Regions:
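Tryptophan-paired
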Residues: 1
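Low-complexity, disordered linker/stalk regions enriched in Pro/Thr/Ser/Gly
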Residues: 4-216
């Protein structure tokens, strides 16, 4: 095959068949030397806006995604999501374009771009991201609603491993606790003992920012 960086010459001869069954061949004509240029494919990256990297995968908390396509040279081509579930074109030569993906289901998705630059050199890029719109679970086992306490109270419960639980006691700073690997959490908070009755509000949030409905 042809090798980039080397020079090649194209030779051309004409011929004519004679009535006697012979053949007349012209002198060979040679082209000027042609250097095979190494293809310079575009470096194209795809990335979801507002993504958070969780366990090595970009994650967004919306079912509507905006994917930014950025190239180091002008490109055009086609994109597809999940082997054709959605698809579109980048018809004009460009170095950047935003791709809108609406109505995505929770889970992992792959978007693929296949295109070429001004020199017709091809390029192929893939990008995997995850959609997570669900908040973590939250169950409070202690304290009991309407219970009597003095200066402190211990809040216990269950949530998703790695989530953050926030405990908001009236007139106190909000306390934060990380849920353990087994899903349990426990935190002792100080109460304002000048108040005869007070609310404690508890809610949880995952790494991407999905929050539970507060529990009082």
């Amino acid at each position: 095959g042809l090798v980039s960086g080397k020079q090649y010459v194209v030779g051309l001869k004409g011929y004519k068949n004679t009535s006697s069954g012979g053949q007349i061949v012209s002198a060979e004509t040679l082209s000027s030397p042609v250097t095979m240029v190494e293809p310079k494919k575009a470096d194209v990256t795809l990335k979801a806006q507002n993504a958070v990297n969780i366990d090595g995968t970009d994650t967004i908390k919306s079912s509507n995604a905006v994917i930014d396509l950025v190239s180091d040279m002008n490109v055009s081509g086609e994109w597809s999501l999940d082997s054709g579930e959605m698809s579109g074109t980048v018809s004009e030569k460009t170095m950047s374009q935003s791709i809108n993906l609406d109505g995505l289901e929770d889970g992992t998705h792959i978007i693929t771009f296949k295109g070429e630059n001004d020199s017709k050199d091809g390029t192929l890029s893939e990008y995997m991201f995850t959609v997570d719109t669900l908040p973590p679970r939250l169950q409070i086992s202690s304290p009991n609603n309407g219970g009597f306490f003095e200066d402190t109270v211990t809040v216990k419960g269950i949530s998703d491993s790695g989530a953050k639980v926030y405990i908001d006691a009236e007139n106190q700073e909000i306390q934060e606790v990380t849920v353990g690997d087994d899903g349990s959490f426990e935190k002792t908070v100080t109460l304002d003992n000048s108040m005869a009755y007070q609310n404690i509000v508890v809610y949880a949030a995952d790494e991407i920012g999905n929050e539970t409905v507060p529990v009082t």
